[in-house]
Amino acid sequence: MLRNPLFPKFKLWFVLSLSIALSWGMSGRAHEVAPTIADFTVDDGTLSMVMRLNAEAFLAGIDLDGLGDTDDTDEGAAYDALRQLDAEGLEARFLPFAADWLARVGVEADGPVTLEITGFDAGEMGDPRFARSSELVVGATLPDGAQEMVLSWPVGAGTLVL
């Protein structure tokens, strides 16, 4: 039986190539842009909204509208640096940012409504191959008798799923 001396080399090359391709695909998940997901409730005239978001992407100043990967932006390096923060470090940086950014989120219910931060959980870093999901909780008192509410999402904030 004849053996091809190139077959073991080809097999090694194939396995290495496959491993590299798979690791590139998995490591990219930390840079894939996901929508902000918000759940809101209104109870006795009080609005509460819980937003699950990528705090590091917002902090880095990335325009998330239509973006698929944070590596495709000039702010990608800043995003990578922010991803290295522990939960306390991210909270210390995000809360002052969020207080200013929240003014750009428009809520109207028989007139403008002012949102206030009522909680923030940076979330644990976990597996660095995946983006961290942080939770921002905001609230507001709605005017008596308000029947409709309109939410305006800021330009550059990416997709919002309610």
Model feature map: region roles:
Residues G25-S27:
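N-terminal signal peptide c-region/cleavage motif recognized by signal peptidases
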Residues R29-L162:
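N-terminal soluble domains immediately following signal/targeting peptides that reside
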Residues W13-S23:
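Bacterial N-terminal signal peptides
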Residues L2, L16-S17, A30-E32:
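Membrane-protein biogenesis/insertion across secretory and organellar systems
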Residues L2-F14:
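Bacterial N-terminal signal peptides that target proteins for export
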